[in-house]
Amino acid sequence: MELLSTPHSIEINNITCDSFRISWAMEDSDLERVTHYFIDLNKKENKNSNKFKHRDVPTKLVAKAVPLPMTVRGHWFLSPRTEYSVAVQTAVKQSDGEYLVSGWSETVEFCTGDYAKEHLAQLQEKAEQIAGRMLRFSVFYRNHHKEYFQHARTHCGNVLQPYLKDNSGSHGSPTSGMLHGVFFSCNTEFNTGQPPQDSPYGRWRFQIPAQRLFNPSTNLYFADFYCMYTAYHYAILVLAPKGSLGDRFCRDRLPLLDIACNKFLTCSVEDGELIFRHAQDLILEIIYTEPVDLSLGTLGEISGHQLMSLSTADAKKDPSCKTCNISVGR
């Protein structure tokens, strides 16, 4: 049987967090003969390995020949924000069950995308299921080392400047390494209604009245839901003043929440004043997208311990947790 030509001119497009479309060129004489495609897909950082996050999944994918371009989809071997290399081979299945194969094409590289809004909406729905009842609170707070606040006073005009979010949480979160903001907490102890006296982030705490960051002029976005191999679950929310750079970033990427009616964090008018509530059963991580003036709040030392084991800095999400994972790339 006549040999097959080697595929060439590979094109990759329509890339998502767990799929891509691929096409290539081959000789006209092969178009009606080819019965199968072999696709060799490897993580770029380890091209010679067949190890993906789940074992025993081959990187050489076999597909029946279909008109090109074709979509390759699968959350079991594709992860978000991950660089891959891909090469293709065409084949004709013969009567004896063996394959006549072409040579391998050139190798091309691409990077998968972030979670889209519909994926984040699925995470949001999962988070809502365990959020629990809403508790009142009155302040947002940020813990850090004393030197951090001294630096803000001395070198930053008494202002906490936004910084780039780390890679904690879901690997596919569009905020990781992209969104600038200042991290705050708002969870309270159910028996006192006050912020806890322990913190993983430092013994010095800046507290600011909730209405300074969260009010009807602020948009609230859902950004992530994750855990770190423990029973605790975290939800990341973004507070962005309407029309700000942070707001424009989030508008196209994150689900927008109704500030007065959602399962995580609310601001509503009751008897003429703003009342704030947070979900009891989630640890909320709040990202405020603008600079925060220290003069708007108070700074003091907490009496509790610094619980480093609870820090979420660059924390990796547990990919096996059924509570906080969805069926797309982790």
Swiss-Prot record:
Residues 6-115 form the Fibronectin type-III domain. Pfam families: PHYHIP_C. GO terms for biological process: protein localization. Highly expressed in the brain. Keywords: Glycoprotein. Gene3D superfamilies: Immunoglobulins. Its interaction with PHYH suggests a role in the development of the central system. Overexpression in heart induce atrial tachycardia and increased susceptibility to aconitine-induced arrhythmia, possibly due to altered expression of voltage-gated K(1+) channel and adrenergic beta1-receptor (ADRB1). This is Phytanoyl-CoA hydroxylase-interacting protein. It comes from Mus musculus.
